[in-house]
Swiss-Prot record:
Keyword set includes S-adenosyl-L-methionine: no
Gene: ENOD3
Keywords linked to the UniProt accession: Metal-binding, Nodulation, Signal
Source organism per UniProt: Pisum sativum (Garden pea)
GO biological process: one example: nodulation
Protein name: Nodulin-3
Signal peptide bounds: 1-24
Amino acid sequence: MAKILKFVFAIILFFSLFLLSMEAEPLLPCETDGDCPLKPIIETTPMISLHYMCIDKECVLFREVLQTP
């Protein structure tokens, strides 16, 4: 009985990880920084700035912590 429960748990875990990986955001192709989205969908605090940059022909999201004067 315990072996069956462990097997079912492993199958559920495997399928949940598979479904999560299917929903992951794919990398966006680009040539320059202008080809990347201007604003990310993620909301941040005023002290953190998020922006995309084109690196190796893919848009990559960067986080920048702003300094207070």
